[in-house]
Amino acid sequence: MSDFDRVRDYLTALQDRICNVVETIDGQSHFHEDHWQRTEGGGGRTRLLRDGAVFEQAGIGFSDVCGTHLPPSASVRRPELAGANWRACGVSLVFHPKNPFVPTTHLNVRYFRAERDGKQVAAWFGGGFDLTPFYPFDEDVVHWHTVARDLCAPFGDERYAAHKRWCDEYFVLRHRNETRGVGGLFFDDLDKDFERDFAYQRAVGDGFLDAYFPIVTRRHDTPYGDRERAFQLYRRGRYVEFNLLFDRGTLFGLQSGGRAESILISLPPLVRWEYGYHPLPGSAEARLADYLLPRDWLNESRICE
């Protein structure tokens, strides 16, 4: 079996595992699966769960696509690959829970290969996961980062710090001067050792289940009202802004002729913007600002709910 097929098999199995956990936790709705083909080459399967008891929308897609010309979002970073044939596979998800006390989350794990004249000229792994709470709990954030740190440990003492920092620097709404959430892990261009890098990708994918779903289970029955719902919809607007303005995966997908319905599945089903909104000082909504900047979560002394 080729290296590419090994990665592909892992990713399709990961999609299945995550979907099974989501359906079990939700207990009400099920994923609808949409198989699609891309005219330029390749295809995928997009799965969407909507209007569940726990998840307002949960979208998770697998894609295996190929082409003969890299889109600008990729070739600008790798000009030496202009004109090369390429193939990429990945799993990407964004979950928008119903309860405002359950954070939105994102995971992406991917593998990219480029060839010229029948010979591989580049191949690398990328991905990561991040968490976007609206009403954050320190306990949840510390759990999230503890799982991230522990899965990084077998890959070197600096891996967690480096990929946490990369996440903090990547998921930033520069026009708002705030991070998208409380971070996690982000990596790209991982190409030193296939077996080691593939093992890390698997650790990230597997670790996501351990990092996210205990938080969902802990918070999805928390009582909330119209005020919390309105704030959740307002903050979802920031998620839309980041994905459409800055996200590399979104730009790559759209510029490469990808399937728009699958690419934009990351966007929430309901969202609102409000001109000049400022939360009341001292409110739970105002408290969120303290979390939307890089912090050393695992070494801070203040740990509370």
Curated annotation (Swiss-Prot):
Keywords: Cytoplasm, Heme biosynthesis, Metal-binding, Oxidoreductase, Porphyrin biosynthesis. Its EC number is 1.3.3.3. Its cofactor is a divalent metal cation. Residues 239-274 are annotated as: Important for dimerization. Pathway: Porphyrin-containing compound metabolism; protoporphyrin-IX biosynthesis; protoporphyrinogen-IX from coproporphyrinogen-III (O2 route): step 1/1. It catalyses: coproporphyrinogen III + O2 + 2 H(+) = protoporphyrinogen IX + 2 CO2 + 2 H2O. The lineage of its organism: Bacteria, Pseudomonadati, Pseudomonadota, Gammaproteobacteria, Lysobacterales. This is Oxygen-dependent coproporphyrinogen-III oxidase. One of its GO terms (molecular function) is coproporphyrinogen oxidase activity. The gene is hemF. Its main location: cytoplasm.
